[in-house]
Amino acid sequence: METDNSKKMIIIGVVAIIIIAIILVIINRKPELVYTISKANDGTDGILITSKSELDDLVKKIGIGENIETNKYKKATLSERYNDEFFNEKKLAVIAVYEDDSKEYIHSIDEVIYDSSKTTATINYTYKGDIYLGTLGNTWYTVMLVEVEPTVTTLNFVNSAQK
């Protein structure tokens, strides 16, 4: 009888530890980071896109290419990924970085940090020209569109490569 009780206590203890571990993982989970990279003819920074029509205006203004690559969804088009349904749930933060044929560039979004009310998003990104290739001529902007929470009203961009 006593061994049955001790077995039950061990099982209850193991289940409790598993439940606590799951709760801690959920509490400490960071929001999913999704961003898009595309080429453009012109640059702009710090813009918060809140609707499909605003995105369409930006595409016309700076010439963002229709084909995009996301860090989660491989290849798509702007209109497929960022439709009216998307803007019901999220907003887009925009950062554009200048590139040319003279260097090999590294660019990525590292993390998005929100304040407690989720109205301010700090976007840590990496951008640096890495290896000098010795050519110059073709220039463009690489536009990174970062998906942020719909409550965001203020953006801060921090280049991790300059820290």
Positions of PLM-derived features:
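Exposed, flexible binding/inhibitory loops of compact, secreted disulfide-stabilized domains
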Residues: 5-163
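Juxtamembrane low-complexity tails/linkers enriched in Ser/Thr-Pro and polybasic
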Residues: 1-3
